[in-house]
């Protein structure tokens, strides 16, 4: 008997289904099921994944949706044709617009308005009067397309329930059909389905009750089993295939039409594009197009005409032109940088006359895939561009792609642990010990946490968390992938409001969009562009020099000298530990060297064993041999090593006779070979083609192995060149305008590898004067202040560094002092009108010290004395009261000031950095007693020396290409030290590695040229040494007891000494205890 399961819920139902479409389709295929109807609740988010699973297995997909209505009625709907599908997507869009984010609010009247051409299956619970009313509605609306589900609930009198539903269906002339309401693909997933129910309902397995499924039967069953379960309803079983035959619609019928663009009057899109290209040529080539570039441009325009992509290029051109008109810094990157047309239009910045790029990497007639242009904008101004796109194309025709937020290790352990009722401290201990998103927790890790690995709930938590990893949690919004259409976008896919105001997203992510060959425009945010724009503004204001990315001096020798020394903290792309370690070895001297530098520190070249051969050849330690002149022409610039994706494509084209389209298919197959195994068909073609062209079989095999090794991670040369431009520009500004770079970098946070504390420390090491936050000098952003009469400038820290201070309050402070500086706390409070809480935050940040000379405690004491502003009605009384105050002035109080160590703690706690001594400096005497040397001494030691050093943990990195090796950067008062932690030590000392704020390391120095690492052999957590750092000062030899609140800095509590009763009751302002025992250093961890 043929049978189709028409009620299947995938895990794209978000915490309802417990299996993926791939698992469901593969299992259904093995069981002999003819087709699957995917009906996720009020959503089509997973339907493209279901289509791909259907293609992979050859099993028929029936597209559907379960509509759970506001009145409790549930109907499964299946569009029979393209028009009905569009009505379904509009219906879901309507419900999402009403319900808001993660909700869908639909009524029966909505179903009536939109379900023409759909098959409907009522999902009843009990055969009662309500069921009869619903069946009558179904019959009236759907007619011969109305069905009712017969599904076992495994309750008492289940067969009687089915019999009565069947009788009601006959009475209202609605046909019955068997469904199994599948939630998981095989019985073993029942426990996970219970857990996701607990997560969704925010309860525990002990309390979930009847919210969970009452039976374990919600898995796929073979047709024979379904026939055994429903022996009296053979016709209802057969109707499953009847519905499959009636539903002829497939997602492959969706035809995407790009929106019409504003074009030159009297010209079509292609002619308009060519008009703009030739119009923009003088901007890029004032002396005319070089002949070779002219040839490339004509080739590209011909291909664009053939592929009908002109509207897409016009769209991106319009967006970039708008951004530039608003002074928003932007630059295209990715494969689009291979295009001469994109360069001439100003979309990208890679000149094809100086860079040998490959257009087929971007657009290929054989590939028949839409182009993909990524444009980066300043991250603080990108929203202006996004809203312009919405205004220009309308919200009916424009929306962002979704991103699928999936469970990773920590999130899975947290949610599963809560669902199973584990104590919060156990959950925290387990999740905090995880590093990578796919990492498993072994028994030894559990024992290290002093937990019992045999505890049943703990074991079940780890097992189910592993099953949950990778499952969708919810939909988010793509950073900037826009889908634009000619007709209504909600005819193609449901649209829902995003969490962020004035944005909307489709239910599909970028992979879904690419699978259906929709075009998208990526409007991305890049923090370094924001930094560069702010740096240019500061330079223009204070240095009287008008700079932008195109006006920066190229090939500046001083800048490259700085780069070769790895003095690149804060710059773009070349600031990471791995990049800094590579710079002294690669020694970039030209822009192309920088392109190689950006690309070589990637998993691809490392896995393809290309880094060391390239470096040896560059240093002259290994000869470069090319079997043929053709190969030398392709790989000459990279010394015979195929470092880029374009290199792999050119080798295939020149040496093996591939066409441009075939070469790009080779690249794509390598990128997915781990998952699809599709690379083997190209291996034979590549090897045989190279042998046929005179290359030795061994050389051909070696070439393919290299390409295969880096294919999945290889970097496009065009992408590397785009990034190298910004890397060079940021390095140039850091080199020649370090104060502007420092201020701009802090003003653009959060971004990059390093926190403001390290940025400021690096700037000071380069001779930049950094001044503290000041109520009379600071603005919201960091600014530059002239040093005396010189042409040098200092960086003044801005109010943005004050934790807890609102932008609006900072703006009120700045506005109030425009004419006159503040002379006291009271003066500032009354003129600015900021709430007292803002004053407290400023006092904690020591912002009253630079101009008012008020230490933290003095400022907080003054804030405590502030009185409420009197109302006009009581002005006379207020005057009398003030006179009384004047007559009975409270005597001045001499507060005991904080120690230097205590001030450092407060600096870190309230501004994230300190301009005083480094915290480790206060511990140096004790560390020296333990034979712990400084980081500088360790990094200057000879190769092979054993050293013992310590510092604050700044950055932890564990790249996927490093085979489990972790790289850590620590810092003391003398500078940073770079650590290497092998996997065995990491597993032994996991808690110390992941949980330390301060760490001691015993290890051996590894020196290769100017690159120095400390290879750790032992690790110790010294975070406890930071406790009570306030006491580490000569002035604090005999610290007062904790009971002496005055000495310990607790202005929020009362003074127990006798005080005269004040004339006017002071206004109580809550001020937390200033004595923070532990310095908390927030490190940055990168995966």
From Swiss-Prot:
It catalyses: DNA(n) + a 2'-deoxyribonucleoside 5'-triphosphate = DNA(n+1) + diphosphate. GO terms for biological process: DNA repair; DNA replication. Its main location: cytoplasm. InterPro entries: DNA_pol3_alpha_NTPase_dom, DNA_pol3_finger, DnaE2, DnaE2/DnaE/PolC, DNAPol_HHH, NA-bd_OB_tRNA, PHP_dom, Pol/His_phosphatase_N. The keyword rRNA processing does not apply. GO terms for molecular function: 3'-5' exonuclease activity; DNA-directed DNA polymerase activity; nucleic acid binding. GO terms for cellular component: cytoplasm. Belongs to the DNA polymerase type-C family. DnaE2 subfamily. NCBIfam families: polc (TIGR00594), PRK05672.1 (NF004225). DNA polymerase involved in damage-induced mutagenesis and translesion synthesis (TLS). It is not the major replicative DNA polymerase. This is Error-prone DNA polymerase 3. The lineage of its organism: Bacteria, Pseudomonadati, Pseudomonadota, Alphaproteobacteria, Hyphomicrobiales. The gene is dnaE2-3.
């Amino acid at each position: 008997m043929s049978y189709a399961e028409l009620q299947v819920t995938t895990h794209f139902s978000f915490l309802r289904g417990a299996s993926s479409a791939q698992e469901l389709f593969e299992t259904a295929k093995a069981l002999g099921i003819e087709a699957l109807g995917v009906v996720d609740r009020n959503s089509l988010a997973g339907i493209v994944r279901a289509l791909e699973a259907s293609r992979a297995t050859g099993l028929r997909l029936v597209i559907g949706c379960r509509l759970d209505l506001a009145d409790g009625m549930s109907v499964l709907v299946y569009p029979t044709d393209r028009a009905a599908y569009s009505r379904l997507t509009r219906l879901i869009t309507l419900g999402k617009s009403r319900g808001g984010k993660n909700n869908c609010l639909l009524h029966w009247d909505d179903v009536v308005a939109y379900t023409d051409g759909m098959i409907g299956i009522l999902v009843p619970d009990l055969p009662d009067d309500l069921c009869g009313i619903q069946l009558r509605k179904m019959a009236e609306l759907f007619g011969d397309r109305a069905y009712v589900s017969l599904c076992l609930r495994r309750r008492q009198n289940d067969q009687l329930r089915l019999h009565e539903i069947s009788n009601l269906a006959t009475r209202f002339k609605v046909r019955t059909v068997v469904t199994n309401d599948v939630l998981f693909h095989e019985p073993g997933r029942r426990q996970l389905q219970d857990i996701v129910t607990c997560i969704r309902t925010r309860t525990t397995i002990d309390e979930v009750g009847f919210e969970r499924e009452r039976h374990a039967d919600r898995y796929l069953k073979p047709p024979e089993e379904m026939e055994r379960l429903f022996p009296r309803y053979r016709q209802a079983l057969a109707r499953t295939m009847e519905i499959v035959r009636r539903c002829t619609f497939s997602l492959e019928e969706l035809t995407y039409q790009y929106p019409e663009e504003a074009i030159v009057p009297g010209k079509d899109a292609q002619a308009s594009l060519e008009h703009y290209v030739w119009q923009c040529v003088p901007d890029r080539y004032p002396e005319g197009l070089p002949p070779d570039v002219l040839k490339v441009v004509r080739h590209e325009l011909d291909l664009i005409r053939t592929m009908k992509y002109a509207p897409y290029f016009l769209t991106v051109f319009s967006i970039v032109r708008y951004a530039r008109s608003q002074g928003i810094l932007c630059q295209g990157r990715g494969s689009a940088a291979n295009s001469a047309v994109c360069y001439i239009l100003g979309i990208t910045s890679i000149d094809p006359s100086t860079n040998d790029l490959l257009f087929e990497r971007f657009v290929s007639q054989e590939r028949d895939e839409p182009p993909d242009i990524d444009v980066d904008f300043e991250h603080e101004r990108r929203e202006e561009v996004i809203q312009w796109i919405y205004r220009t194309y309308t919200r009916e025709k424009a929306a962002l792609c979704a991103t699928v937020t999936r469970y990773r290790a920590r999130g899975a352990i947290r949610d599963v642990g809560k669902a199973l009722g584990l104590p919060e401290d156990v959950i925290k201990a387990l999740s905090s010990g995880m590093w990578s998103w796919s990492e498993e927790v072994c028994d030894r890790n559990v024992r290290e946490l002093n937990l019992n690995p045999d505890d049943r709930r703990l074991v079940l938590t780890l097992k189910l968390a592993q099953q949950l990893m990778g499952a969708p949690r919810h939909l988010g919004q793509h950073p900037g992938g826009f889908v634009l259409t000619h007709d209504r976008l909600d005819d193609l896919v449901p649209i829902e409001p995003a969490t962020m105001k004035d944005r909307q997203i489709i239910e599909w992510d970028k992979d879904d969009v690419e699978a259906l060959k929709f075009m998208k425009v990526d409007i991305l945010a890049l923090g370094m562009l924001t930094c560069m724009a702010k740096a240019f503004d500061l330079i223009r204001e204070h240095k009287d020099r008008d700079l932008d990315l195109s006006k920066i001096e190229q090939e500046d020798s001083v800048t490259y000298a700085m780069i070769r020394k790895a003095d690149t903290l804060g710059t773009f792309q070349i600031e990471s530990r791995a990049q800094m370690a590579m710079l002294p070895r690669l020694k970039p001297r030209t822009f192309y060297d920088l392109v190689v530098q950006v690309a070589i520190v990637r998993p691809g070249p490392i896995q393809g064993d290309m880094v060391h051969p390239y470096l040896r050849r560059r240093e002259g330690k290994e000869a470069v041999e090319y079997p043929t002149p053709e190969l030398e022409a392709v790989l000459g610039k990279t010394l015979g090593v195929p470092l880029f994706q374009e290199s792999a494509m050119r080798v295939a084209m020149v040496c093996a006779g591939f066409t441009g389209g075939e070469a790009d298919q080779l690249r794509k197959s390598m990128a997915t070979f781990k998952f699809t195994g599709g690379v083997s068909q190209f291996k034979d073609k590549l090897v045989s083609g190279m042998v046929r062209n005179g290359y030795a079989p061994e050389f051909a095999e070696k070439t393919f192995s290299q390409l295969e090794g880096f294919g999945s991670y290889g970097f496009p040369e065009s992408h590397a060149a785009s990034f190298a431009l910004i890397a060079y520009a940021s390095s140039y500004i850091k080199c020649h305008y370090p104060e502007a770079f420092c201020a701009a970098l802090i003003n653009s946070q959060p971004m990059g590898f390093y926190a403001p504390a390290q940025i400021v420390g690096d700037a000071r090491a380069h001779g930049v004067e950094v001044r503290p936050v000041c109520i009379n000098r600071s603005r919201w952003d960091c600014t530059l202040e002239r040093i005396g009469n010189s042409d040098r400038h200092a960086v003044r820290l801005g109010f943005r560094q004050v934790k807890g201070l609102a932008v609006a309050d900072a703006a009120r402070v700045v506005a109030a002092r425009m004419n006159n500086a503040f002379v006291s706390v009271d003066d500032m409070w009354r003129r600015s009108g900021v709430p007292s809480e803002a004053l407290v935050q400023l006092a904690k940040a020591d912002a009253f010290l630079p101009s008012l000379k008020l230490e933290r405690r003095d400022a907080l004491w003054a804030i405590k004395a502030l009185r409420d502003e009197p109302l006009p009605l009581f002005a006379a009384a207020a005057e009398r009261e003030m006179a009384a105050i004047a007559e009975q002035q409270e005597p001045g109080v001499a507060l005991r000031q904080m120690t230097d160590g205590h001030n450092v703690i407060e600096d870190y706690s309230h501004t994230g950095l300190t301009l005083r001594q480094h915290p480790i400096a206060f511990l140096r005497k004790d560390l020296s007693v333990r034979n712990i040397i400084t980081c500088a001494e360790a990094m200057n030691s000879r190769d092979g020396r054993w050293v013992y050093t310590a510092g604050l943990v700044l950055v932890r990195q564990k790249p996927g290409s490093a085979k489990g090796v972790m790289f850590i950067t620590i810092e003391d008062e003398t500078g940073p030290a770079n650590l290497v932690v092998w996997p065995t030590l990491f597993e032994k000392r996991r808690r110390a590695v992941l949980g330390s704020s301060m760490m001691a390391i015993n290890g051996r120095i590894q020196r290769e040229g100017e690159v120095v690492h400390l290879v750790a052999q032992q690790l110790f957590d010294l975070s406890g040494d930071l406790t009570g750092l306030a006491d580490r000062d000569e002035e604090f030899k005999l610290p007062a007891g904790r009971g002496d609140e005055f000495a310990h800095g607790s202005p929020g509590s009362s003074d127990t000494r006798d005080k005269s009763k004040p004339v006017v009751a002071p206004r109580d302002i809550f001020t937390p205890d200033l004595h923070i025992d532990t310095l908390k250093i927030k490190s940055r961890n990168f995966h």
